[in-house]
From Swiss-Prot:
Gene3D superfamilies: 3.30.1370.30, 3.30.1490.10
Record's protein name: Small ribosomal subunit protein uS8
Keyword Cell cycle: no
Tagged with keyword Transport: no
GO molecular-function terms, A-Z: rRNA binding; structural constituent of ribosome
Function: One of the primary rRNA binding proteins, it binds directly to 16S rRNA central domain where it helps coordinate assembly of the platform of the 30S subunit.
Residues that span the membrane, as ranges: none
Keywords linked to the UniProt accession: Ribonucleoprotein, Ribosomal protein, RNA-binding, rRNA-binding
Alphabetical list of NCBIfam families matching this protein: PRK00136.1
GO terms classed as biological process: translation
């Protein structure tokens, strides 16, 4: 699929992704398009693996300046989104790092924390198993 219109770049790409997910969830949109990056794609893969999103697709832009990624939110038969909330934790002005012993439980284990580690982006559960700490990017429930 080729896209003509490029979304605006944002200062904090991770914040932009979570804002788009939250807005799409509230507006009950099915698909969302944003500028692609390796970090965004890694986050989307985690959300798909955990069952929060249906799929994603990397799109080519006509001007070929920036790649785009389009992802599909997952809904139940009653049009209830599988994502109830997203909260960004680490921000450009205040990075939050934790060791694996101090990684938070989101809603007593019902949600996930997305962690950026030296081994890549992963959930808090995987980081605890690997005994790796890192930067807490966001909570998803």
């Amino acid at each position: 699929m080729i896209i003509n219109k490029v979304p605006k770049a944002h200062f904090d790409p991770v914040s932009d992704l979570f804002t788009k997910i939250n807005n799409a969830r509230k507006a009950k949109l099915l698909t969302v398009t944003t500028i692609a990056s390796k970090l965004k794609i890694a986050i989307l893969e985690i959300l798909i693996k955990e069952g929060y999103l249906a799929n994603y697709q990397v799109l080519e832009n006509k001007t070929k300046t920036k790649k785009l990624v389009s992802f599909t939110l997952k809904y139940t038969q009653r049009r209830i989104c599988s994502i109830n909330g997203v909260k960004q934790i680490s921000k450009p002005g205040l990075r939050i790092y934790r060791s694996f012993e101090k990684l938070p439980l989101v809603l007593n284990g019902l949600g996930i924390a997305i962690i950026s580690t030296s081994d890549g982006v992963m959930t808090d559960k995987v980081a605890r198993l690997k005994k790796i700490g890192g930067e807490i990017l966001a909570y998803v429930w």
